[in-house]
Amino acid sequence: MLGKLINKFFLSRNERILKNLNDLVIKINILEKDLLKLSDKELKKKTNEFKLRLKYGDSLDSLLPEAFSVIREASKRIFGMRHFDVQILGGIILHKQCIAEMRTGEGKTLTATLPAYLNALTGKGVHIVTMNDYLAQRDANKNRILFEFLGLTVGINVSGMSRLDKKNAYLADITYGTNHEYGFDYLRDNMVFNSEKKVQRKLYFALIDEVDSILIDEARTPLVISGPIENSNILYDRINSLVSDLIPQNKKYDNSFNEIGDFCIDYKQRQVNLTEMGLKKIEKLLVKYKFISKEESLYLSKNIFFIHHILLALKAHYLFLKNVDYIIKDDQIIIVDEHTGRIMSSRRWSDGLHQAIEAKENVFIQNDNQTLATMTLQNYFRLYKKLSGMTGTASTEAFEFNSIYNLDTVIIPTNKPMIRNDLPDLVFVSKSDKMNAIISDIKNCVFRQQPVLVGTVSIEKSEKISRLLNKLNIKHNVLNAKFHSQEADIIAKAGEPNAVTIATNMAGRGTDIVLGGILKKENNEKFFTTKNSVKLLNIWKKKNRLVIKSGGLHIIGTERHESRRIDNQLRGRSGRQGDPGSSRFYLSLEDTLMKFFASENVIKIIKTLGLKSNQSIEHPWLNSAIERAQKKVENCNFDIRKQLLEYDNVINEQRSVIYNERNKLINKLDIHDHILFILKDRINFCIKQYISGNSMNVDSFFALEKELKNNFYFIKSINKFLEHDTTLYENVDKLIDLIVTTIQFSYNKNTAIVSKKYSNMIEKSVMLQILDIFWIEHLNAVDFLKQSIHLRGYAQQDPQQEYKRESFFMFQSMLEAIKNNVIKSLINIFFVDFKKNKNIYINFIDQKDYDSFHFLIMKSINIT
């Protein structure tokens, strides 16, 4: 009942929003008549006119009707495609920083040109975000001619580009790229030593295609730039051998540590927890195999990391499956994207998990990595001044979009009514019965020449269906998604008569399945005037009619995904633009969703029906029960993403402080006064260790002098200061000022050996490198803290509050350590190293060999 009320409220709210925008759509349509009279040259001039009006005070909102009319008219002239009214609505919604839910085939790519053109008029840059490099290049190349016709520039930002090419791409009015590339560029920009090496401008407007995949599905995996660290990988092998000695609890989801067993597996959270019994056994095993001595405890600070390694090994064995989560190729573990089924050859799991899986599979164990920079996608996209997105499936995640990103979701009506027939789910007792029914459905589709798209949840299951079809000599395509361009071609042919296409549920998004197949043409005019093209067109029309007669594209879901939205995405491949189509999901009690998340009552009732071999059950009640199971998983995944964001918000505040400091250092020509300020702060801190109240005793003089000499090359005698001015005994502040002035004078004298240009570059390089060294150490220390902080829960402490508190103290300690080491290193360079290496520093700067210069600085830095 509550769900129906929420839906009713949401729909009525949606209708109100669309109704309020209707007048704006009418206004845009009226303006269309005036633009028909303009020549191409006159239409192009509109862009400069809009820019001038913005400059003199007009707002983007006031320009919207005219700007949308102009790009619609340009699209008609360039592509022969006129934006539908529903696409105009979508464009307005995107400009107003909302999520536009537009069904598959409704022309999201063309819709995006509307807000992209309008916001590009500001000159601040529009970033259109896609799921992969292929889609970024395809959409950029397709729309480039349209935007360039109107005087705007288009850039492409994909992996493998040079820094200069990336910089030029970001300088364009409209840039197409992938979410990861935008995020990694931001992190890389905050690791450079020179502002000229930055590629991004200030982040203004991001328009995200398939926004649910990028902001929801991929939000659980943070962006991480890592570098190798030297370490021994033997430990992973040795710990891996202990796993067989550990026994899982019988109730795999029960976290009450009363069950017999060494560890329990939480499949919902994808976590492994050790029981008290397990911890005792592990301690005995570590002693037995001589990891630790008999006298030592597992809980000693130097041994606690063994628990982390054992948990990694258990995760590798029980939660990460071959040909589902990863494949083995060329003696390497290659990650399979859980959402798309794509091979992620350039990525590795962090925190030692990848090494644990390598040990499990007995392949070469590569070195551990340390985190150099990290950020969640949530926090990256929240840096943009304006953010919006579009997808075919957003309404189920409307709450998350609003609570995390402050984005409202608006459902855009379809241009033509949806007539797809979504058939009820069929539930079988066993997987084999279900598979027989799926194969039978495919055979029937082939018999009536109906194209069928079979959606699976993993590569392994795709290959299993493929093997069964091969035995029956049924021609089919398997979408392995290794190459995005090949993926698009296979999807494009999936609408042809008799076509059988097997794909992971999310693969091929971004390419429409056209009934009869896609008819390729260079351009409309040339295509329809050639004799051969007319012949091809007639062939396509015949195929199109045949497919429509057979029932349109049929979708088969081989099991329910843990998210309703992913199921809707699969269904949404059929029934585009009012086309006929159908969909059916096949389930079994052995499916992951049913086994782990469906209620025991549902499974019990189905079993009591006494279904025979190859018999199935279908009922609206059953569909509701499955939906409830999916909602459970969705809520669980939302909690995981929310928790990830809450933890990252803590580090995000610290990251902002560090990145702001870096930017100030990079952009400032002279940081000498800043260094003198830090020097004064460190001297004051040092002196106050030896001062009690407002006076100091003579015994402290010698200890203080020694400390000042060691840290600041202070060669004066405090006694002589006191002999010269006896009031200093009682006026400690005056004495401190005298010591500070003396040391600062000495520092200035030594830096003046070279010109300001050289000394400033040295100061800047030291400051930046030490900042980076300690920030990297801090990131890894905080990550280690995060991995173990949940244990505080057993001591009746709030892990999240404890994490905030401890990470704050760690951050404060890091800032103090940075200041200490900056001063120590600069004094070492200017007071000691300059005596022998001064000319080397100067030569590197003069020759603009900055890599060698920074390396020389690094060698002179002595971290304590």
Swiss-Prot record:
Nucleotide-binding is among the record's keywords: yes
EC number: 7.4.2.8
Gene Ontology MF terms: ATP binding; protein-exporting ATPase activity
Subcellular location, record wording: Cell inner membrane; Cytoplasm
Catalytic activity: ATP + H2O + cellular proteinSide 1 = ADP + phosphate + cellular proteinSide 2
SUPFAM superfamilies cross-referenced by the UniProt entry: Helical scaffold and wing domains of SecA, P-loop containing nucleoside triphosphate hydrolases, Pre-protein crosslinking domain of SecA
GO cellular component, one term: cytosol
EC main group: translocase
Membrane-topology descriptor: Peripheral membrane protein
Primary location group: membrane
Family: Belongs to the SecA family.
Subunit structure and binding partners: Monomer and homodimer. Part of the essential Sec protein translocation apparatus which comprises SecA, SecYEG and auxiliary proteins SecDF-YajC and YidC.
The protein's name: Protein translocase subunit SecA
Organism (species): Buchnera aphidicola subsp. Cinara cedri (strain Cc)
Organism lineage: Bacteria, Pseudomonadati, Pseudomonadota, Gammaproteobacteria, Enterobacterales
